[in-house]
Amino acid sequence: SKSSTETPLSYNQLNYKENLQRFFNSKPVTAPTQLDPVNRDSSYASTSREDACSAISPDHGGECSGGSGSSGNCTTNSNIRMSSFTNTSITGTGTSGCGNSGGKLSESGPVEVGGAAADAGPSLAADNSIPPISVTLTESLLN
């Protein structure tokens, strides 16, 4: 007789392939759609992400007025709380304007950001553009 130290296979182990095939053929519902956190309110989450992206996009719409050597007024159409740049300098060093340039300032002097006067103006990057903003959306912000 032949001896073995292995445990004999059970009925379920012997029929694993058939059981697996029968499971997938029955097309089970593993997670109901209304309880799936990813798809629970996808239209809202998608809209919120698009709104957030458009709010921090440097290519936002805007209106500007002002010319060479004058103070320029730029109003953005974004949802960021900082809604306008107003250059109050009388002695300009170039033309003022924003358009879709991301709110670049080309004149020196005090700058009002959202109505609060600042002596040195906003902190700008080396190329005189507004530095990128990093926003992390968490689930608590989307609810």
UniProtKB/Swiss-Prot annotation:
It is found in: Nucleus; Cytoplasm, Perinuclear region. One of its GO terms (biological process) is rhythmic process. It comes from the Eukaryota. It comes from Drosophila picticornis. Phosphorylated with a circadian rhythmicity, probably by the double-time protein (dbt). Phosphorylation could be implicated in the stability of per monomer and in the formation of heterodimer per-tim. Signal peptide: none annotated. Residues 71-93, 114-126 have a biased composition (Low complexity). Essential for biological clock functions. Determines the period length of circadian and ultradian rhythms; an increase in PER dosage leads to shortened circadian rhythms and a decrease leads to lengthened circadian rhythms. Essential for the circadian rhythmicity of locomotor activity, eclosion behavior, and for the rhythmic component of the male courtship song that originates in the thoracic nervous system. The biological cycle depends on the rhythmic formation and nuclear localization of the TIM-PER complex. Light induces the degradation of TIM, which promotes elimination of PER. Keywords: Biological rhythms, Cytoplasm, Nucleus, Phosphoprotein, Repeat. The lineage of its organism: Eukaryota, Metazoa, Ecdysozoa, Arthropoda, Hexapoda. GO terms for cellular component: nucleus; perinuclear region of cytoplasm. Residues 25-130 are annotated as: Disordered. Forms a heterodimer with timeless (TIM); the complex then translocates into the nucleus. This is Period circadian protein.
